[in-house]
Amino acid sequence: MERPGATTLKGNPLTLIGPELKAGDKAPDFNLVDNSLKNVTLADTGNNVRILSVVPSLDTPVCDAQTKRFNEEAAKLPGVDILSVSMDLPFAQKRWCGAFGVDNVKMLSDHRDGSFGSHYGTLIKELRIESRAIFVLDRSNTVRHAEYVKEVAEHPNYDAALSAARTAASAASA
C-alpha cells in the first residue's frame, strides 16, 4: 500500500509505504536489529507500555533532539519503555548513544529490509528511510496513540505522546 503525499521533506511531497495506523489498531509485529546485532520482534520488547519513536536518522538535528528528549523523559515514566527506530546502522546508533550519553532509550535499526517501516506505514519510498512518527503501544500491543509528522523536518507532538503513555501505564497498573 502506497500513500502518495502522506509526508513532506522541506515542502516536497513524498510517498509512505504501508498502512496508516490509528489508535485502537493492533500493533503489527516487526523484525529489527539492536546494537548487539540481535534480532528484536514486538514480543521481545516486553510487557510494559512502549513509545516507539521513529526517526529518519540520528545524524540530523530534529532526530537528535527527539531522541535526547525521550531519553530525558524516560526516567519520569515508570512502566514505560522507549524504543527509537531508524534506518541507521546499529554501529552508528551505538556510537551516537555513546557520544551523547543516551542510555534510557533502546535503539533499534530497520536497515535490513525496512519491514518495520512498511508494517507501520513510515517507510519513505523515494528515500528508503523512515518518516518521523510516534506510536504508543499498551501492554496488549494495541496502538493507543499514533502520530505521523506531516513535515519530516518538524518535531512531533511530544506532550500528546507522553500523555498517552502515562494514561496507558496508569490503566495497566490499575
Name each model-derived stretch.
Residues 1-174:
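Chalcogenol-based redox active-site neighborhoods
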